[in-house]
Amino acid sequence: MEQELQWLLTQRIPKVVLQAQNSLLGISLLGHKTGPNGHTSRGTSTDSHIHLHDTKTGEDVGEVTVSGAAVTHLSLLLPVSASTQPMRRTTTRLKMDEALPLRQAQEALSFIKSATKKTRLMPRLDSSETALDYVENMLSDVKRARQILTVGSQLELMPLQSDSTEKFAPALPENLVIECKFKEGSIVVHLYFLKFRRGVKSSGGILDAFKKDTAAGHMLVHNGRLAEVKQELVFQAPLGSMASDLDSLDQAASLLIDVVGQLHAFDSM
């Protein structure tokens, strides 16, 4: 039994850690590349131009450009009530330096970097307890990164402003806010048309501090003030690079889970 444990500590685990490292180094999260030193760098081609589809109708409703960990451009078919036509294609750009940070990507990258760093800094594995603590910590980083990229939790709402090339393009309503996030290997764009309640005045400005109040249903809250979601549009498109990155995380997790199981078997003896 002691011989098997020594084989696990001196041969099996180092080999698995190297394989997990290779899987992590294969991740190019939306143009980011994790190097052997645990730092991320950007490749020469990082922009992803993706066609968005309405999740209800399946219609092509525009494009989104994802550059690194941010959305830098949106071209959407939006309903504008002031127009004689029910739908008008309006090119929009985001406020806040005309880019919307994809905080999921940023947060997931921090865990990927942490896991990659752990693969390079293997401690002296002189017991099953030491090895288990080391591998489980690495596995926790990998699982957390994958969870962040697939859950699609509420992140950040921001206002839009029109950048249309049309001569008589209608202005975007002030009560329109947008949210971009990842969910199950796709980029998802939510558009919310708000109606302010409890005497709240027209937005007129910054709405980026809004957060979804799931307990209140289709309500948004800002500094204790409520706004009702009068209309919600959901546009979505698959991200091929994201699917590949999730596969790489799954590969790393599978390798580490196998080792954790072997180490637990020794602890139970």
Positions of PLM-derived features:
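N-terminal intrinsically disordered, low-complexity regulatory tails that precede a folded domain
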Residues: 1-136
